[in-house]
A protein has these predicted regions:
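A short hydrophobic beta-strand element within the catalytic core of glycosyltransferases
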Residues: 68-69, 84
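A short, well-ordered alpha-helix in the C-terminal region of glycosyltransferases
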Residues: 119, 126, 133-148, 154-160
């Protein structure tokens, strides 16, 4: 979360009044290293960085967004990035396992080093400024979702795993 807010603030002079950074999700009260709600609210910037909290339905958020950003230190396979691909959004995320499975840097988004707000800001800025690249990456995200995350492919891969286990036994 901090890298997202820091990146937005690094871009503030160039883009305030032109874009809005929207942060969705609850504060993790169990995570002692996480941001508390009060601290998070103190970091927001009116009409520029907004926190909308937990959203039961993310589809409207994705469809209203031009870019999806997920700075993470570690992930499984992020559902949020699969959903972003499915709705055809370009993605900026960190170069960590899980996120790498959803983003091919330079194809449907950018992978940046974890904990690097400057690199995150640079990648977001590139996509804000380049409408054609944003649209191209969005189309490519949708193609990636259809190719890699379709139910047919997932079922086929699961079946293949079971087949290989049966052969080994």
């Amino acid at each position: 979360v901090m890298e997202f807010i820091d990146a937005a603030k690094l871009l503030q002079k160039r883009f305030i009044g032109k874009v809005k950074f929207i942060l969705a999700g609850d504060c993790d009260k169990e995570n002692l290293a996480g941001l508390g709600e009060e601290k998070l609210r103190s970091l927001l910037v009116d009409d520029y960085i907004e926190w909308i909290g937990y959203q039961a339905q993310m589809f409207p958020i994705y469809t209203d967004s031009d870019i999806v950003v997920l700075p993470s230190y570690r992930e499984g396979l992020p559902k949020s990035l699969i959903e972003a691909c499915a709705v055809g959004r370009p993605i900026v995320t960190t170069d960590v396992p899980g996120c790498r499975e959803c983003v091919k840097s330079g194809y449907n988004g950018y992978l940046v080093p974890a904990k690097d707000s400057r690199a995150l800001a640079d990648a977001i800025g590139l996509l804000i400024e380049d409408d054609a690249k944003r649209k191209e990456f969005g189309r490519n995200s949708r193609l990636l979702a259809e190719e890699e995350f379709s139910i047919d492919k997932v079922v086929r891969q699961t079946f293949d795993i079971y087949q290989s286990i049966i052969r080994i036994s």
